[in-house]
Amino acid sequence: MNRIKAVGYENNELKEKAQLLADQLNLQLDQNADTCLFVTPEKLTLKIRNFSLMFADFSAMTWSKRRGEGKRQGLIRACKPTKGIKILDATAGWGKDAAILATFGADVVMLERHPVMAALLADALSRRNEADIQKMCLSLIASDAISFLHSLQEKDYPDIIYIDPMHPERNKSALVKKEMQVLQQLIGTDHDAMELIELSLSHVKSRVVVKWPQKVKPLLPPDASIDGKTVRFDIYMAQFSSN
């Protein structure tokens, strides 16, 4: 898949909105592009040839249905999200893991450095109604995680940092979902994952949780791990100590 180079739109009534987005992201405006950010009357989507339109979704109704299965997931067992816990999702992607964590009451801040993915996440947040906002405490910062962590003051360190780096191993599996296939091709491998993990350890109050392919050696020896069928969650205890 080529990099996203254009913003398209469904009808002429949406042209102005699409133009504003194209200007904001420094992309071309092309109504007929077959690979683009695509503006519809309802939402901002990602249009990829041979795929149905893809979009982020943070409606409470969607994610409350997955809360029950979430209790059994390694994600929840590793992060232990509860009301009042502040979690920084340093690699938000489509925001699905962040949404699951938020349904358990955690205050989740998503970081996303890719401008196209950040635009899709921002649009999903803007579509929430009051009930969605009350049930899921989610926010977005369009930023590189390493730069963001360097800018944090000690008093603002999150309780937990969650990292789900892009890994080339995922491209080899036929079972990888279409959203992950697209994300892998759009963003590519996170070559700075080691740097991000090491920095996170000194900028977190409790622990860092890293989602990693089950059969791949961890980047750093973890303090604990929770295994799943295809991935595991490596847990690293904080190296931060307040003066």
Swiss-Prot record:
EC number: 2.1.1.242
Root EC class: transferase
Residue numbers binding S-adenosyl-L-methionine: E112, R113, D164
Molecular functions (GO terms): rRNA (guanine-N2-)-methyltransferase activity
Protein keywords: Cytoplasm, Methyltransferase, rRNA processing, S-adenosyl-L-methionine, Transferase
Any one Gene Ontology cellular component term annotated for this protein: cytoplasm
One matching Pfam family: SAM_MT
Assigned protein family: Belongs to the methyltransferase superfamily. RsmJ family.
Name of the protein in question: Ribosomal RNA small subunit methyltransferase J
Source species: Legionella pneumophila subsp. pneumophila (strain Philadelphia 1 / ATCC 33152 / DSM 7513)
Gene: rsmJ
